[in-house]
Amino acid sequence: MHDENTRASVRARRPAPAARVRAAAVSVAAVSALLLGACASDTDPIDIFGHAGWQGGLADAHNSASVTTNGSRELSLDWMRPLGAPTATRPSIGPDGQVTVTSTGDVGCALGSFQGATGRKRFCNSLGPSGISSTAVADTASNLYAGDDGSMSSINPNGQLRWRTPVYGVPRTPQFLPDGNVLVMTQFGQTNVLSNQTGVAVAPILDLVPPPLPLDLPNAELRPANDGLLTCLVGGPDCAVAASPAVDPSSSTVYVVLWRAGAIAPQLVALTYTGGDTPSLEEAWSSPLLPSSVTSSPVLSPDGSRVYLTDVEGTVRAYSTEDGTPIWSYFVGDRAAGSVAVSPDGIIVPAGGAGSRLQAIRDAGDRPESLWKRDDLVQQGSPALAGGSTGYTVTGNDELSLVTFDLTTGETVDTDAMPGSTGYSPGVVVGPEGEVVVPTALGALYSFR
């Protein structure tokens, strides 16, 4: 199960994814946890928020795609390795530097964990074929939380299964709630709150899109777990929840883009989480219908007063977290539909893809303010932001490069080649020691220090 990649000696720099099940059966399964291979040594709470790694797909509860760790401006290629299969999402990085990637690998190797210092494979685990659609999230003990077809699982740092819980659908990238419980939403809108230690449901299931009830429709069948996942890529009613929610720990509020049954467009929805002995979730408000489909995650401003959405047309829109009122919009262009990155001081960098140029804006209250734009740099993936006013993104055509830029001015401060890379990157991530890790969609991993 272990192997070693050949550590790159090159330190080059150059500019440049059907079972038929009746509703009665799944309604029982959805409220019971299938506890398998419990390998945790204790049941003490885990300080979920106690590390500086890249916790999940978009780094943190706010989905900010930023870290406070000071970003290096003098990077060199440290190692590179093939994944053996395509990947569609960013990796996560745990507090020990462990890099975890989901891919379309064979049945036994769709969840890969790699040593941050060397790129050596630590373990490879099985996931269902839809596991590639989300990122495995890391906690402060380097436990992982990964979703696949009809289940949510937790794996310890050695690759052993801690617990596995059935859900209805395929989980989007999970989030942690303020008390450390795991928030699991599927593309069908089923919302679960699970204990991070045992996987047991600690709150009633909230179905944002109610499934068919046996008494109302006795012959109705539930949808296969992976139904509608392709729709999540483009936006449509078959995918109620296309991407991971954002969580504001300070107000215990969850924000999600939801396409309700029968609606002609999605809405931004806020859920209030109540912890304690009897945790629960309930809807607080919903915005007006959105002007266009949204397939990326909502992102919170640093002070929690705004939610930023990017629609499939390439427009960034700001909404009030008080009641979902639309505030302003900014057209990025070129159908760049990924989530924005937001620095701790509020600078917003839109995602790349589809030919969008690297640029930055600021939320000026009732309007967006353009800070700078690089017409010469077309992003081939989503950026990451770090402390010290430093940002990273992927550019290039025939071969990709990692570009380090000054967040305040947009100026390039470093360019590092990614030898042999083509296509695009799901996005850049930054580790606890300032290491920068870049996956490519075709299945390679590059680490810079």
Regions found by a protein language model. Name each.
Residues 41-88, 92-449:
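Extracytoplasmic/lumenal domain signature
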Residues 4-28:
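Bacterial N-terminal signal peptides that target proteins for export
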Residues 35-38:
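C-terminal motif of bacterial Sec signal peptides marking the signal peptidase cleavage site
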